[in-house]
């Protein structure tokens, strides 16, 4: 099983790339985290936010592994504890499907994409920079894995 984080946005600051890379490299080979950056659609006077999100949806879908479980990050998504994420990670590893976490662009994710996602989750009730969400999600995936392994990284 591979974990894919598909994120709309590119040209992140070095500290974002470094933070993401730190947690991604800690993951074991059978549960690697891969980042797929999706170039955002340029907003202009002729393109509404809805049009841009629909165009980004097509780019996201093209970048995802076939048959992957789709977990969309959204402000209205379900709150998960680290332990709950660890339980989901265990289930996902058992069924063997790849899992794709989707981070939308400046306007979020297309409504149709969210409707078709297997699950909506949120990282925080607060608004966060999209680059930081990459780092936080990678850290939480590593934490979830460490919980499943009784690794001392996660302390209760």
Swiss-Prot record:
Homodimer. Belongs to the RNA methyltransferase RlmH family. InterPro entries: Alpha/beta_knot_MTases, RlmH-like, tRNA_m1G_MTases_N. This is Ribosomal RNA large subunit methyltransferase H. Specifically methylates the pseudouridine at position 1915 (m3Psi1915) in 23S rRNA. One of its GO terms (molecular function) is rRNA (pseudouridine-N3-)-methyltransferase activity. The keyword Transferase applies. It comes from Janthinobacterium sp. (strain Marseille) (Minibacterium massiliensis). Pfam families: SPOUT_MTase. The gene is rlmH. Coiled coil: none annotated. The lineage of its organism: Bacteria, Pseudomonadati, Pseudomonadota, Betaproteobacteria, Burkholderiales. Its main location: cytoplasm. The keyword Methyltransferase applies. One of its GO terms (cellular component) is cytoplasm.
């Amino acid at each position: 099983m591979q974990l894919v984080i598909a994120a709309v946005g590119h040209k992140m600051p070095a500290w974002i790339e470094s933070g993401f890379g730190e947690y991604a490299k800690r993951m074991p080979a059978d549960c690697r985290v891969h980042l797929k950056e999706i170039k955002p659609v340029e907003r202009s006077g002729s393109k509404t936010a809805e049009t841009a999100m629909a165009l980004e949806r097509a780019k996201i879908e093209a970048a995802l592994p076939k048959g992957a479980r789709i977990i969309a990050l959204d402000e209205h998504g379900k709150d998960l504890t680290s332990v709950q994420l660890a339980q989901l990670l265990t289930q996902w590893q058992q069924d063997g499907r790849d899992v794709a976490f989707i981070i939308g662009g400046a306007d979020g994710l297309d409504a149709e994409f969210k409707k078709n996602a297997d699950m909506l989750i949120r990282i925080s009730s607060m608004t966060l920079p999209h680059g930081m969400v990459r780092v936080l999600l990678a850290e939480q995936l590593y934490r979830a894995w460490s919980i499943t392994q009784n690794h001392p990284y996660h302390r209760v």
